[in-house]
């Protein structure tokens, strides 16, 4: 059983922000307006506080995320990808790196559960708000850009 104490402070900071980075990947794939972005962010937050598995590692992450929310701390604090054309690539690289950290120290089952959690978080963010259209008409629940990014998130974390 892997717990928070198995990771350095820097590693743990990256691990607890990973669900939010997975949600950010979706927002970057097809940026909508402020309401769509807020819905996607809230979906990522909900997923980050409700892991789909009972693995101790995921429970520890969720508890720390809940504490951050209660203290009104930004879960993406310290994560500042550069503003460039390669922003999506940087976000996927962060997810890949965090998954490598988890895979190196956690059991295979925990690493798989963590990867699945990141994928499900990206799916929740994508499904949270319709994209495109006009005043909701003709909009897609999950845009082509978001579908592509979900596949890239899955590939990045090996999920």
Q: Whereabouts are the PLM-identified features?
A:
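Small-residue-enriched hydrophobic alpha-helices in membranes
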Residues: 1-159
